[in-house]
UniProtKB/Swiss-Prot annotation:
Binds 1 Mn(2+) ion per subunit. GO terms for biological process: L-arabinose catabolic process to xylulose 5-phosphate. This is L-arabinose isomerase. It comes from Vibrio parahaemolyticus serotype O3:K6 (strain RIMD 2210633). Its cofactor is Mn(2+).
Length: 497
């Protein structure tokens, strides 16, 4: 069973009647075998459905319209087995509103040198059939992914899956609702943005709800459900026995359990897969949710602190994209620096870092929260797993959205942090702190980000390409002067476009 077993990619083979029924029968058989091979690959996370060989403009238009109207279809994979005159594709492609991947492969890997004849040549024409098809994609100015290689190669499977996961992310965004509890943190700029523009570009809705509505649901959670939740905490996390033996501490734990259950119930009732809150708007709640928010993120909900709905949405989308991959995804903030031979960033937030990124079993503790609401709040404490990761920021530039991605290397802290009462990750930005921070600032990247060790750079590149949004990357190849010029060039391109 595939990871995303409720969605499909439609495989459509291009040809024409010119070649006769015998060749078309071979085309159909070869397509069946390729699809079976791709579906048998553990590297491909979405089922691929055979939608046959299209040979006329009407057949092409029909399959494109059918794809548009099928909610389970996240995109098309198109392959030209033979020559398929590309004017036949104009009507279909101009009406297609799903993304497509152009698979540039052929059925056989090697040429049968001793047997090759013109029948073989006329059957296996993807080398020039795909070029004809490629022209019309370019002529129509359609963004698409082109995967080149033999269909049995593992790298081809991985390239296909990157695109599949990007298409899944686009689909997730089109069905996402973000719930806002309270407004943005006062006077903060980068967390603002045009919600109408975001819905047009990404598909997700951003809706505000009163804290009174939320607190009513939170307060309705029964003591029995709270106690059951506390039992779960005891099984899942390291903790001091005092959390349950001390009556005051247990009361705080019960408050947090009630917040988690109430928030989850409310979010599900309004169909929201992501949410925001802010420490400046907590009327009716006992405290800023800590453990509650961390656990909701671990369940797949997106989160953005201080009203940051763009990061909340992207956190959920990337959690969906990364399903089944090693590593986790979390809301994150660049918090403080460690300047030295290798400049490092200690990332954290006041409370809300997702335990899916933890290097070891998280520890549940209660500490004083000193920003906004001053009270004791339960939270999970851990360090992030070492290894390569990404920080991703989506910003609203007025005329467009920009995605900024920094490739980073997460490392184990050289010493314990006994007095730091929050979850955290320590990383070394690529290519180094000086260039990465300067590039991030020049690009306008937010102080919040989506941190992920599950989602890859190719997935995000495909995601940005499908949506037609700007993407800039900061990694080991970044040269600051060239990066600044790229930003200038992009500004001209998107304004003229």
């Amino acid at each position: 069973m595939k990871i995303f077993n409720d969605k499909q990619v439609w495989f459509v083979t291009g040809s024409q009647h010119l070649y006769g029924p015998q060749v078309l029968e071979s085309v159909a058989q070869n397509s069946e075998e390729i699809i079976a091979g791709l579906n048998s690959s553990d590297d491909i996370s979405v089922s691929i459905a055979n939608k046959g060989t299209v040979k006329t403009p009407d057949e092409i238009l029909a399959v494109c319209r059918a794809a548009n109207n099928d909610p389970d279809c996240i995109g098309l994979m198109l392959w030209m087995h033979t020559f398929s005159p590309a004017k036949m594709w104009i009507a279909g492609l101009t009406q297609l509103n799903k993304p497509f991947l152009h698979l540039h492969t052929q059925f056989n890997a090697a040429l049968p040198w001793d047997e090759i004849d013109m029948d073989f040549m006329n059957l296996n024409q993807s080398a020039h059939g795909c070029r004809e098809f490629g022209f019309i994609g370019t002529r129509l100015n359609i963004e698409r992914k082109v995967v080149v290689g033999h269909w049995q190669e593992p790298q081809v499977h991985r390239d296909i899956d990157d695109w599949c996961r990007a298409a899944i992310g686009v689909n997730a965004g089109q069905h996402l609702k973000v719930a806002r509890f309270g407004d943005n943190m006062r006077q903060v700029a980068v967390t603002e943005g045009n919600k109408v523009s975001a819905q047009i570009q990404f598909g997700y809705e951003v809706n505000a709800y009163g804290l009174g509505e939320l607190s009513d649901v939170v307060n309705s959670i029964s003591d029995a459900d709270v106690n059951h939740q506390l039992d779960k905490y005891a099984c899942m996390y390291e903790m001091s026995p005092d959390l349950f033996n001390d009556s005051d501490l247990k009361k705080l734990m019960a408050q947090e359990a009630r917040l988690e259950l109430g928030m989850e119930s409310f979010l599900k009732s309004v169909g929201a897969g992501a949410f925001t809150n802010t420490f400046e708007n907590l009327t009716g709640l006992t405290n800023l949710p800590g453990l509650a928010t961390q656990r909701l993120m671990a369940k797949g909900f997106g989160y953005g602190g201080e009203g940051d709905w763009k990061t909340a949405a992207m956190t959920h989308i990337m959690k969906v994209m990364g399903q089944g991959k090693p590593g986790g995804t979390s809301f994150m903030e660049d918090y403080t620096y460690n300047f030295g031979e290798k400049g490092q960033v200690l990332g954290a937030h006041m409370l809300e870092v997702c335990p899916t990124i933890a290097a070891a079993k998280p520890r549940l503790e209660v500490h004083r929260h000193t920003i906004g609401c001053r009270c004791d709040i339960p939270r999970l404490i851990f360090s992030g797993q070492s290894g390569e990761a990404l920080n991703v920021s989506i910003i609203d530039l007025g005329d467009r959205f920009r995605m900024i991605v920094n490739v980073i290397d997460t490392v184990t802290p050289p010493q314990s942090l006994p007095h730091l009462p929050v979850a955290h990750a320590l990383w070394e930005p690529q290519p180094n702190l000086n260039i990465a921070a300067a590039a991030w600032i020049h690009a306008g990247g937010a102080h919040h980000a989506v941190y992920s060790q599950a989602v890859t750079l190719p997935m995000l590149a495909d995601y940005a390409e499908i949506l037609g949004i700007e993407m800039v990357v900061i990694d080991n190849s970044t040269n600051l002067r060239q990066f600044k010029q790229e930003l200038r060039n992009n500004g001209v391109y998107y304004r003229l476009g």
